[in-house]
């Protein structure tokens, strides 16, 4: 038990330092190795903390976020909320709990969009949508199980890109975007239209990101 607590503490400290350094040095193994060096963590210990290095750091951060979101969501009476309001609330909590990652997210997205990481990215996006639907109490096990998660994955990715460009106070614009997007899923807005929104947001994000690099 004590060893687990020590390992968990080291993981958290290293992941936090990594996130701080990512905007400057990128989401990479080299960045993680440099962070470990700063904290006097040997490569052998690092391999125990994060066996797949920068990939496992990402999984660790996602798991942390999900734990916080679940705890916050279950801290109030959510049983009377409609399904769409449950989804909206959970998504808002996810972005609120990710606020400290905002500066690192452009590099994280570049990492996830590498050709060799695409399948992993799709899997993570599906798992994220699955987490949100399950926490909302979704019990579907038919075709709608996949269509719901597919649509929510599109919405989550679109919201992520929108959020990165959001300069509004307390991210109110992102919350409005979440509300309209989730209503779109529930009210049957076509997947084609959702994909067009995502494409437009992605083009806007990457054009801004490239401008900031020049």
What function would you assign to each model-found segment?
Residues 138-197:
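Hydrophobic/aromatic-rich alpha-helical bundle segments in the mid-to-C-terminal region
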Residues 1-6:
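Short, Lys/Arg-enriched N-terminal segments with co-localized hydrophobic residues
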């Amino acid at each position: 038990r004590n060893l687990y607590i020590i390992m968990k503490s080291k993981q958290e400290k290293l992941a936090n330092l990594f996130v701080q350094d990512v905007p400057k040095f990128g989401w990479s193994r080299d960045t993680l190795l440099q962070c470990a060096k700063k904290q006097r963590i040997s490569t052998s210990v690092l391999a125990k903390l994060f066996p797949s290095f920068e990939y496992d750091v990402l999984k660790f951060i996602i798991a942390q976020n999900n734990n916080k979101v679940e705890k916050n969501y279950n801290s109030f009476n959510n049983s009377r909320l409609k399904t769409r309001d449950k989804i909206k609330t959970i998504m808002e909590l996810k972005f609120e709990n990710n606020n400290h990652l905002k500066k690192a997210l452009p590099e994280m997205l570049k990492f996830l969009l590498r050709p060799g990481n695409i399948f992993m990215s799709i899997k993570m996006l599906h798992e994220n949508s699955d987490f949100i639907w399950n926490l909302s109490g979704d019990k579907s096990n038919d075709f709608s199980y996949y269509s719901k998660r597919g649509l929510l994955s599109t919405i989550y990715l679109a919201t992520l890109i929108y959020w990165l460009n959001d300069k509004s106070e307390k991210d109110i614009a992102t919350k409005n975007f979440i509300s309209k997007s989730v209503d779109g899923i529930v009210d049957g807005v076509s997947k084609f239209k959702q994909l067009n929104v995502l494409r437009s947001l992605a083009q806007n994000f990457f054009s801004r990101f490239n401008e900031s690099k020049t």
